[in-house]
Amino acid sequence: MALLALFALLTPSITAAVAYEPAADTGLEPGTIHRSADGPTVVSAQGYSFRGETNPRKPARLVSIDADGDLEWTHDESGAWFFEVDPMPNGNLLVSSPRDGETVVFEFDPDTQERVWQERFDMTDTHGVAYLGDDRIAIANMREWNDSAGVSDDRVVVYNRSIDEITWEWTFRNHYPAETDGGYNDDWTHVNDVEPVGDGRLLLSPRNFDQAIVVDMETKAIVERLGTDGDHDVLDEQHSP
């Protein structure tokens, strides 16, 4: 199943991720499908929900498009955001849905349009989650500001649903200088993605650091890195890689 995360913007205007060039603007036109996809594509739309205010015309939404480009189904929720949506081995979907200062992670059954289970975390604005198997969920915990210490505790954790515990944790300030991206603040890393990439390795996307990294879960070492903080010729505050 192909997956794509589409994040609706919170402002009335739409800003492209690349510089706008009027001469290159040819307008929007229908695409042409030259061959069918291998399966459906599920898109998550962020929706609009801010400080208790919602816009009924901009709900958080999951949309499934079949292999031939036709709409299969939609699933809307109000008072929430949808970020990552990932396929699970059983054909269901893993969804990250922040709301009101917490994050709800749930398994969604496309056939019944119902949640199989859900977990609530005291985490704000969580974009990236990933299923690692054996009831383990990796969570990119951004905006984890430690006000009393004046430092960022932004991290990636692995939560085990079977035992209701965090069993692995990787904190960015243990691996980056404090002056990275201008120094600690309440959105220091904006880590927006976590994905398993091989045996015991995670791909992380600290957006504000202009880089994507691979971390060995056993040694906790950064074993691969693409990009450097401030070098926008390689990556410039990327979204999910």
What are the functions of these language-model segments?
Residues 52-59, 98-102, 147-152, 187-189, ...:
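Short, solvent-exposed loop/turn segments at conserved positions within beta-propeller repeat blades
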Residues 66-69, 108-113, 160-164, 216-220:
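Short loop/turn segments that connect beta-strands within beta-propeller blades
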Residues 35-38, 87-90, 131-134, 196-199:
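Residue-level detector of Asp-centered blade-edge/turn motifs that repeat once per structural unit
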Residues 1-23, 194:
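Secretory targeting signatures
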Residues 70-131:
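Blade-loop segments of beta-propeller domains
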Residues 58, 80-81, 124-127, 152, ...:
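Beta-rich catalytic cores
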Residues 77, 116-122, 163-189, 220-236:
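Surface-exposed loop and turn segments in beta-propeller and other repeat-based domains
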